[in-house]
């Protein structure tokens, strides 16, 4: 049976208990255990790139990691992946900081990784690449003669041509992506956006609905919405509360809780969320003294100015809103710029009456799914969800809102706070059914199954396809 080789920017430590804290790690480990294989990625450390790979083997899985130099890490990861691709793919061209040296570093590191992986590959390996850090990776492997089946999954949104084509190197990136055999996206909108970008640049031949050829390269596109571990989350949420949390729950017995947890990131719509909550307090005064909104937003990329600006903005808005609407004995908004243990968050989800998840743009947003999975089915909370989160395509029984419309979000919060138990139970049951069916294992099994169905490339077939392909006419 073919081995599975997984490549990601970072690898989870070879400690199953630690890895289980993150959904992606669970899915990847499940796939690796089923097939046996290798997880290859950056160690998280800077140092001499020429050092031998660090290898750890447990059972039928090998972890192989490498160091990056300070320059390579800065150019590949900070300056290009996170200062160009991340904002552009989240529709924030105003925050893109394109620099040629960073682009060169991005390509250089992808080539370096291909060189390091090449000696580890076997002829029948199936290779699965993850996320925007590694868009050119298949191209680098093909240049080195690798004809194995290579799949790619994009965890973040794929932008429309108007956005993507603004990147100075968009044409190169698109052609490199076509070196993958299978391109997986979170939503159908993302898949179609990619094909639109491609069609604007070159002639694309579509043999069936999701099988295409461009630049003589045959590839398939498909949608694989990533899932979670609902049973594990329900187990964590239902366990006994720590003493401090139990005390807080008792103190807030007659207060309805609106809860959000997100990384401090401009894509998450946190300032817009605060302002929508202010509209709720202004237009629905009957809730004064009876609700509390808690926003947990741990610092992410704190050395980047755009992230510093959001943190200062949230601090100012929280103080202003509390100063305007707060009363003796009642603080309407709690903003915590801190990290909390994942298991504790699941318990907080369970006793929260409303889960507020309103990103401006998000590939999926697993927090929304985790909130649903953490609820008590007999007395569940209500999910208020942005239409621009990938999860909105599946969780259609949530209260779907436009995060840019403060009045709509405020009205949804009022509806959630006053919703009947029967409606809450019905909506929750519908969403939980979707989450259980499309869990993290279903996600990885579908992707790997589809990748296995693809006939491996050969040098002869690639050359034959090139002869039969013509450039797009002007």
Curated annotation (Swiss-Prot):
Keyword Disulfide bond recorded: no
Protein name, as recorded: Trehalose-6-phosphate synthase
Record site feature (Involved in alpha anomer selectivity), residues: 86, 156
Catalytic activity reported: D-glucose 6-phosphate + UDP-alpha-D-glucose = alpha,alpha-trehalose 6-phosphate + UDP + H(+)
Species this protein is from: Escherichia coli O9:H4 (strain HS)
EC number: 2.4.1.15
Residues binding UDP-alpha-D-glucose, per UniProt: 22-23, 263, 268, 340, 366-370
Function summary: Probably involved in the osmoprotection via the biosynthesis of trehalose. Catalyzes the transfer of glucose from UDP-alpha-D-glucose (UDP-Glc) to D-glucose 6-phosphate (Glc-6-P) to form trehalose-6-phosphate. Acts with retention of the anomeric configuration of the UDP-sugar donor.
Residue sites binding D-glucose 6-phosphate per the record: 10, 77, 131, 301
Keyword set includes Disulfide bond: no
Pfam entry (one): Glyco_transf_20
Record-linked InterPro entries: Glyco_trans_20, Trehalose_OtsA
Pathway terms, separated by semicolons: Glycan biosynthesis; trehalose biosynthesis
Molecular-function annotations in GO: alpha,alpha-trehalose-phosphate synthase (UDP-forming) activity
UniProt KW keywords: Glycosyltransferase, Transferase
């Amino acid at each position: 049976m073919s081995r599975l080789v997984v490549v990601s920017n970072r690898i989870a430590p070879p400690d199953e208990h630690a890895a289980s804290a993150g959904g992606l790690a669970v899915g990847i480990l499940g796939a690796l255990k089923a097939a046996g294989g290798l997880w290859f990625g950056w160690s998280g450390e800077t140092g001499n790139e020429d050092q031998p790979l660090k290898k750890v083997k447990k059972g039928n899985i090998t972890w192989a990691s490498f160091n990056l130099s300070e320059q390579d890490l800065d150019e590949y990861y900070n300056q290009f992946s996170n200062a160009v691709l991340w904002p552009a793919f989240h529709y924030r061209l105003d925050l893109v900081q394109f620099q040629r040296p960073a682009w060169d570093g991005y390509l250089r590191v992808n080539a370096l990784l291909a060189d390091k992986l090449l000696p580890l590959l076997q002829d029948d390996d199936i290779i699965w690449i993850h996320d925007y850090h590694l868009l050119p990776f298949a191209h680098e492997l093909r240049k080195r003669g690798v004809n194995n089946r290579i799949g790619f999954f994009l965890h973040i949104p794929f932008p429309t041509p108007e956005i993507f084509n603004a990147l100075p190197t968009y044409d190169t990136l698109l052609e490199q992506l076509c070196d993958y055999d299978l391109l997986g996206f979170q939503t159908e909108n993302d898949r179609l956006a990619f094909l639109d970008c491609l069609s604007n640049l070159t002639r694309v031949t579509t043999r069936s609905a999701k099988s295409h050829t461009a630049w003589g390269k045959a590839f398939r596109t498909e949608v694989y919405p990533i899932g979670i571990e609902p049973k594990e989350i329900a187990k964590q949420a239902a366990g006994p509360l720590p003493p401090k949390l139990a005390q807080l729950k008792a103190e807030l017995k007659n207060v309805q809780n609106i809860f959000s947890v997100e990384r401090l990131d401009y894509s998450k719509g946190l300032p817009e969320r605060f302002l929508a909550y202010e509209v709720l307090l202004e237009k629905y005064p009957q809730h004064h003294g009876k609700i509390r909104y808690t926003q947990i937003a741990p610092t992410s990329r704190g050395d980047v100015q755009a992230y510093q600006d959001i943190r200062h903005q949230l601090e100012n808005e929280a103080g202003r809103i509390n100063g305007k609407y707060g009363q003796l004995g009642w603080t309407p908004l709690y903003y915590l710029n801190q990290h909390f243990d994942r298991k504790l968050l699941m318990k907080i989800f369970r006793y929260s009456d409303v889960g507020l998840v309103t990103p401006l743009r998000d590939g999926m947003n697993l927090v929304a799914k985790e909130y649903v999975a953490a609820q008590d089915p007999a007395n569940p909370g209500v999910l208020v969800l942005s239409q621009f989160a990938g999860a909105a395509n599946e969780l259609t029984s949530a209260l779907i809102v436009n995060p840019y419309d403060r009045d709509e979000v405020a009205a949804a919060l009022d509806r959630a706070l006053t919703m009947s138990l029967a409606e809450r139970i019905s909506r929750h049951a519908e969403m939980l059914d979707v989450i259980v069916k499309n869990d993290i294992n279903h996600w990885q099994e579908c992707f790997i199954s589809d990748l296995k169905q693809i006939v491996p490339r050969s040098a002869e077939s690639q050359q034959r396809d090139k002869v039969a392909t013509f450039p797009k006419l002007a």
